[in-house]
Amino acid sequence: MEPSDSASTAMEEPDSLEVLVKTLDSQTRTFIVGAQMNVKEFKEHIAASVSIPSEKQRLIYQGRVLQDDKKLQEYNVGGKVIHLVERAPPQTQLPSGASSGTGSASATHGGAPLPGTRGPGASVHDRNANSYVMVGTFNLPSDGSAVDVHINMEQAPIQSEPRVRLVMAQHMIRDIQTLLSRMECRGGTQAQASQPPPQTPQTVASETVALNSQTSEPVESEAPPREPMESEEMEERPPTQTPELAPSGPAPAGPAPAGPAPAPETNAPNHPSPAEHVEVLQELQRLQRRLQPFLQRYCEVLGAAATTDYNNNHEGREEDQRLINLVGESLRLLGNTFVALSDLRCNLACAPPRHLHVVRPMSHYTTPMVLQQAAIPIQINVGTTVTMTGNGARPPPAPGAEAATPGSAQATSLPPSSTTVDSSTEGAPPPGPAPPPASSHPRVIRISHQSVEPVVMMHMNIQDSGAQPGGVPSAPTGPLGPPGHGQTLGQQVPGFPTAPTRVVIARPTPPQARPSHPGGPPVSGALQGAGLGTNTSLAQMVSGLVGQLLMQPVLVAQGTPGMAQAQAQAQAQAQAQAQAPAPAPAPAPAPATASASAGTTNTATTAGPAPGGPAQPPPPQPSAADLQFSQLLGNLLGPAGPGAGGPGMASPTITVAMPGVPAFLQGMTDFLQASQTAPPPPPPPPPPPPAPEQQSTPPPGSPSGGTASPGGLGPESLPPEFFTSVVQGVLSSLLGSLGARAGSSESIAAFIQRLSGSSNIFEPGADGALGFFGALLSLLCQNFSMVDVVMLLHGHFQPLQRLQPQLRSFFHQHYLGGQEPTPSNIRMATHTLITGLEEYVRESFSLVQVQPGVDIIRTNLEFLQEQFNSIAAHVLHCTDSGFGARLLELCNQGLFECLALNLHCLGGQQMELAAVINGRIRRMSRGVNPSLVSWLTTMMGLRLQVVLEHMPVGPDAILRYVRRVGDPPQTLPEEPMEVQGAERTSPEPQRENASPAPGTTAEEAMSRGPPPAPEGGSRDEQDGASADAEPWAAAVPPEWVPIIQQDIQSQRKVKPQPPLSDAYLSGMPAKRRKTMQGEGPQLLLSEAVSRAAKAAGARPLTSPESLSRDLEAPEVQESYRQQLRSDIQKRLQEDPNYSPQRFPNAHRAFADDP
């Protein structure tokens, strides 16, 4: 019995029940079933409609799970809503990978609605099609119609990239065998192809490919590119066909899991043996022999194709066209298989048993290996569920027509609260008009972020980025989704090889489409003038953006093709700053092209040119070494991938990588770098924070950049206005629950203050914003909005250029104290500032083992002085448009050199360096939720490992900074010390006039005393405080000056108490006051004796009343007071911390009576 729409009403018969079933995608379906049907039969009845097998269904009604053996009537569910969820997978076995429903993709590919959907044209997406996925595994269908990724946040086992290469090769061998079988048995194929799409059961056979922390390449060729005149559905393969694999081919079609995938239980990588490689190569040879006769016929057809007349030979034309398509697809798969296997090597110098290893990751190659994959970083917060569903652009079979129109975008139904991106490109025009149901539907990739808020989902449609001449555009087919759902809009532009890209954001409340670009009409307009690279750039930009917003940004790897190493930037501290007032310099920018989850998945989105060959043509190399270093430090998203315009534009790709994959980042070096001739534009320019932060948290100057001149972005880049509108749309959607206004330019400081309810988080002198670096953080947070930061992350440095005057003024006032920015003054201020960090450096390295003979304190201080001197000189002197680019380069270079320097000083022990970093994080995060601190330290350890493995700074570059014990002091600080002494002569005479004590006592106490909190690192600010406080400083003894200054700064750190509270009235927190009660000596002897007797459990010999009267006698009480005073006097005399000058009235209370 077919289900009807939830809005429909059906006449209920006495022996029937109307049951409403609501699934997790918020769709409600109505079923009319017999009253005597039991729950198991009901599950089987609805399985086809909900695309969930009956054995995996769990029906819940009023908090109870319906039992299979009971009847529906017993639960009284008539007319009620039952919730349907999927049963959790078994945790003790490998996934079977063969449980997809029959309707998961048929609506998408056929264009006709299935019964039970909520509107015509809506597609039925099985959220968990192709079964579940265990830790670190992907279930991939045999035809590429859907890919669902469920990522378990637990630690994934270590597996082998060579093993994945073999699995990929075996999958492609299986596909080649299927194509050969179709060519050899044409009859069955024709019968299959003659069925119309809506009636074709979409039975998806899954394969399980184990991808783990060593995997760097995506499983490709599950959705191969389409020929514009392909008459048949290439990937539609019956699951009953058994591939003719060799005995080593452990990837049979159907539910059997892929054999070579190692079990997730193992902790060591299961590398394949060379014998397995040989077996796969032998199978390839057999396939080549089978393909040879068809290849000869293929050559004959192509040789005569230019002049052959098919006017009266429709059957011959279809046969030849079919042969061309199938042989061409076979050649593509065969070539990809050889490419996948060509990087497998065996090192004969190793001791047996030897295994295979990979010399070049798949990301090294451009589009032939990773074509038609959307650039989606999978970002996961702890506890989130991420589902990536990729629906390949698959032309459905048609009875006699060879028409597939890749230009039309299929309207797709999305769940509520979805962030939708439709990026569809046009292909070649079809030979004739084709009906909308025969259109080629775009690849759909969804990423759900489930948290307390409703699901935030990113939905991106990307079709073939084939650079073909613009064809006749076709309108979207069918209505744009049912009410209440996000709409997927795909507009085509005649004459453009790439269609414009649309970003539509919808919230759970009344959804409204939000066009992402300001230049065109609101919804139906077309983006003009964004350049040929818009599709790729926007796909990558939105991918990285949504990923960063859903989680912590972590790493980037880029470089020129000639470089051997790639840059990897560690995690930024922006999120920690937003959640706790930490004294970091700025909400550090994070990369857009690579991001990682909580120790599970590291996803990099890349784009490169799409030439016909398998290798990327080398772009022009910069001539200068500093230019190469600039490029190495970062190229994120400025312009699109290819350096030259024209049809050969980049294709969005997806590369699935895991933390700690050396080959991945090395391949990214070659793969990411397109034509660049100028230093990259930067993100925010925070100077280095205090030393421990410089070594620990890499916030100061995260990777970023683009391929643009310092004056602006290149002609192929996205306009800043367009970029801003996209960012505002996504931010408004994701931050709407926090009260953010749409299109708001609210600063980060105002945003955090509004959320925290406190008005002094970023005010000068408030908690977490003291000292030079705290004031710098306050400046950046007050001037940067969320949109500005995200734009900076993606290489649009306009916000940074806008902040240049404020930064220069800030450095002039807070750094130089109003003096002229001469080299001597800058050196003096740098020395004063960095010297104040000595206690922090000493504290940070107090618990780790430093390399023998190395003076770690001097090494860090002198290194930071040199680096910060360059940064400050640049900020104070640079006035041209290259301000931001050079500043970013200085910050990045200083950061990497700092990490490399300290790693060298710690004897190359990464664990020691991680201990320094995590210790600093814990000290900075006092009072923060311990689980958050633990997560931060864990994430930092993972990121640090990746960064250190691919450090772009070699040991030779930092040896000049190493200081040994006994080395002569550096001569540079002498001048600052002299100037510093001259500067301080002004307040000293006043103090000498006010007190006979030496005038240097206060300065000595200040230099020897512990610096107050992170803010105390700024000694020039302390000097300023002394100068500003001259009136009271002259009126008190000089030794009181540092004590009063410390008290002032300590009082500023204390958060204000609510007015007129108990704590306010009593002068101390209520909890502390309660714990203090009863402590200290009792002034009444009777009370003291009573408490002592009670504590000891003693009982008086006489009555308590008689004892009390005796103790209250005046002479006894006076003797007690004298004894108490004597004890206190003795305690004060023996206390080294007691000073009569600090407590001038103490003698009145405790001295003998006059």
Swiss-Prot record:
Region (Disordered) location:
87-125, 186-274, 387-442, 463-531, 568-626, 673-719, 968-1154
Positions carrying N-acetylmethionine = M1
Matching entries from SMART domains are given as: UBQ
PTM field? Ricin can induce a cleavage by the caspase CASP3. The released C-terminal peptide induces apoptosis.
Keywords for this entry?
A: Acetylation, Apoptosis, Chaperone, Chromatin regulator, Cytoplasm, Differentiation, Immunity, Nucleus, Phosphoprotein, Repeat, Secreted, Spermatogenesis, Transport
Question: Where is the motif named Nuclear localization site mapped on this chain?
Answer: 1034-1076
Keyword Ribonucleoprotein (UniProt): no
A GO cellular component term found in this entry reads:
cytoplasm
Q: Which GO terms describe its biological process?
A: antigen processing and presentation of peptide antigen via MHC class I; apoptotic process; brain development; cell differentiation; chromatin organization; endoplasmic reticulum stress-induced pre-emptive quality control; ERAD pathway; immune response-activating cell surface receptor signaling pathway
Q: Where is this region: BAG-similar domain, required and sufficient for interaction with UBL4A?
A: 1080-1137
Q: Gene3D superfamilies, alphabetically?
A: Phosphatidylinositol 3-kinase Catalytic Subunit, Chain A, domain 1
Q: List compositional bias (Polar residues) regions by residue number.
A: 209-218, 410-426
Q: PTM Phosphothreonine: list the residues.
A: T117, T1075
Q: Where is this region: Sufficient for the delivery of client proteins to the endoplasmic reticulum?
A: 1044-1154
When this gene is knocked out, what is seen?
Lethality associated with pronounced developmental defects in the lung, kidney and brain. Lethality is either embryonic consecutive to abnormal brain development or perinatal associated with pronounced developmental defects in the lung and kidney. These developmental defects were associated with widespread aberrant apoptosis and proliferation. Lethality can be partially rescued in an ICR genetic background: mice are slightly smaller in size than their wild-type counterparts and show impaired genotoxic stress responses.
Q: Where is the composition biased (Pro residues)?
A: 249-263, 428-439, 508-521, 611-622, 678-702
Q: What is known of its domains?
A: The ubiquitin-like domain mediates interaction with the E3 ubiquitin-protein ligase RNF126 which is responsible for the BAG6-dependent ubiquitination of client proteins. SGTA also binds this domain and competes with RNF126 to antagonize client protein ubiquitination and degradation. The ubiquitin-like domain also mediates the interaction with USP13.
Summary of subunit composition and partner proteins: Component of the BAG6/BAT3 complex, also named BAT3 complex, at least composed of BAG6, UBL4A and GET4/TRC35. Interacts with GET4; the interaction is direct and localizes BAG6 in the cytosol. Interacts with UBL4A; the interaction is direct and required for UBL4A protein stability. Interacts with AIFM1. Interacts with HSPA2. Interacts with CTCFL. Interacts with p300/EP300. Interacts (via ubiquitin-like domain) with RNF126; required for BAG6-dependent ubiquitination of proteins mislocalized to the cytosol.
Protein name per UniProt: Large proline-rich protein BAG6
